Amino acid sequence: MLVIALPLHFYLESIFFYTQILYRENTFVASVNFFGESLRFCGIFAIINTNFRQSEVSCMKKHPLLTAAAAAGTAVLGAAYGIYRVAFYQKPTTAVPSPADMPTREVYRKAMCPDADALARDTFTPVHITAQDGTPLAARYYHHNDGAPLAIIFHGYRGYAVRDGLGGYTLCTKLGYNVLLPDQRAHGYSGGHTITMGVKERYDARDWAVWARSHFGPEVPIFLMGVSMGAATVLLAAGLNLPDNVCGIVADCGYTSPREITRKCLPEYLPGFPLGPTYAIGRLGAILFGHFDPEDADCTDAAAHSKVPIFFVHGDADGFVPYEMGRRNYEVCRAKGKRFLTVHGAEHAVSYYHDNTAYTKECTDFLQDCLTRRHFAWPKEAPDDAR
């Protein structure tokens, strides 16, 4: 048996964190049973005997080091599960936020509410596909013009398609585009219970693009757009073999990698815990319980290998995804036609509403440039009613 020796304070902090999680979620008995079965299954504390309890006690007396290792393993697994629950687990909810649920800052809410009302009045068609790993995926399709370009807009972490994609939907609708608003896995009407920060979502984005090409034909241009984790999703998708009619990507406030954003955010969710062991345990939880590794994807690497032009947008007052991450993604990108827009003073995921004039102009120019590169003439002009 391989036993990894770690400092005592590491185990104590793990046990404390595990206890807090179980107490808060009121799942102590179920979790103890779950981890007991997991440990036995893994052979950490495996004793096969008809008189199981007596054998456990006997083993504990005869093998104190094995017992200590089992206790430490339980604590680590418990902490791993706790961090997984906090950071990556989510039950999909079909509730749709009202305009009153928009960001609390009044300056943004006033600008977003009219667009939210317009989206709520727009007619959509529900669309369902199955991801490559069998997860059911759902989306809303808004048809505006036959033969128009299609914008597929991905929302962020624990977000809503009709909220995070609101700016993109509004802009693209004014341009006459058709719009597809997918629910990311573990969100909305899509299946799954694990948010993988783009690791698996990138393949979902490709699956939606493949569906769109099959449904609308290869002659219809497709744009992949995303905000926050949605931006990371489309950036990571840029590193895949996308359909040839995907002609542009818009990444609004995307991070550099699932690993880096997880390391950045964990201290905010779990103050007082050392980052190194906390991230290591959180990564273990993602692998064991979420079946993904945060280190299996890198947005900068995907951007560097993208064959599709990318428009990067980032607010320099972003407190969630650092502005420097957006700049790094842009700097490594080698795709022709790439652009970067700094929205001064914009907080996280509100650049479109913070400076609508600049955002609308720059994004519209980028989209039109992508269409021109593909020799696709779309008659709609840039919207002139920017706020």
Name what the model sees in each region.
Residues 157-171:
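The serine-hydrolase catalytic nucleophile loop
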Residues 67-129:
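An N-terminal hydrophobic leader/cap segment in hydrolases
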Residues 305-306, 312-314, 318:
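Short beta-strand/loop motif that positions the catalytic acidic residue
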Residues 236-292, 301-302:
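Hydrolase active-site cap/lid region
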Residues 308, 322-331:
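Short alpha-helix in the alpha/beta-hydrolase fold that links the catalytic acid
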Residues 346-357:
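Catalytic histidine-centered segment of alpha/beta-hydrolase-like enzymes
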Residues 172-191:
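Conserved alpha/beta-hydrolase
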Residues 161, 187-218:
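Catalytic nucleophile-loop/oxyanion-hole region of alpha/beta-hydrolase
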